[in-house]
Amino acid sequence: LFTTASQPVLSGLIEGTNPKADFKGIEHIKEIIPEEFALHDQLRRVKLSIDDTGKTYDEIAAKVSEYNKVLCIVNTRKDAKELYDRLPNDGVKLHLSRMMCPAHLHETIGKIKTLLKDESQPIVRVIATQLVEAGVDIDFPVVFRQEAGLDSVLQAAGRCNREGRSAMGHTFVFSLAAEKRKLFGSMADSNNARLNLPEDSDWFAPSTMKAYFCQLYSRKQTFDEKDIKHWLYKPTELCFETASKEFRLIDDTSINVIVNWENSMELIEQLKESGCTYS
């Protein structure tokens, strides 16, 4: 069962830059939602505005500050800090990024949810990295999103008017000035695939999402960088264990670090006393 707000193209042949990048897709996919496009129109609750002309940090911060309850999502922790520092101190302003430990993130997200429901707190502005685009249930009437692929843009829009409290929420896509952009690798490929779509596209339409992923896939050199298919289709053996070790849905080269947050050091001391070690 595949379910997401930004469903990739999963069926049909899409040709890449070489035969290794050809995507043959999955056959016989069945849509479980009747009248998909009609339902899509009924659930439309966000207006999306895109401005790809480069702006400075000061210009973006000034635009964000025009709104009292607003979320701004950027691509890097540096961009998050630059914009956060430029926001006025006329209300509550908060920051979310992986510079915070999970417990701190969880606490701050809970605080944001409480503040958004507090009518006595009219100004709540949040600057965040992409971590809020997946699995974070927050709802702002206005969302800003730094330039990115269409799938990321729509995930950001999913934090806007999420509960349908207003007739229409508004999501703005902006671009930083050239010297600040610094998009590399897959992020640059995703953004360029979006830029190649017609400017008058219906950005929420399933057909537009399909066109976007066709653009993105066509730029690929290969879909199997570690040649995992080789281990699954050897004539004499099926090397499932080797393939499993090589496959990573999301590359993760991180190392867990225990930091002093709330009562963590007390817990660490208890572990040490019990003879446990952490490495």
What spans do the regions from the language model cover?
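Loop/turn-to-beta-strand initiation segments
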Residues: 1-2, 69, 122-125
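A short beta-strand-to-loop transition that corresponds to the Sensor-1 phosphate-sensing loop
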Residues: 3-7, 13, 74-77, 128-131, ...
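Interdomain hinge/linker at the junction between the two RecA-like core domains of SF2 helicases
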Residues: 5-64
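Short secondary-structure boundary/capping segments
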Residues: 14-23, 87, 142, 188-190
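C-terminal helicase lobe and adjacent C-terminal extensions/tails of nucleic-acid helicase motors
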Residues: 58-67, 73, 78, 82-109, ...
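Conserved two-lobed SF2 helicase motor
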Residues: 117-133, 145
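Conserved ATPase-coupling elements of RecA-like P-loop NTPase cores
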Residues: 136-140
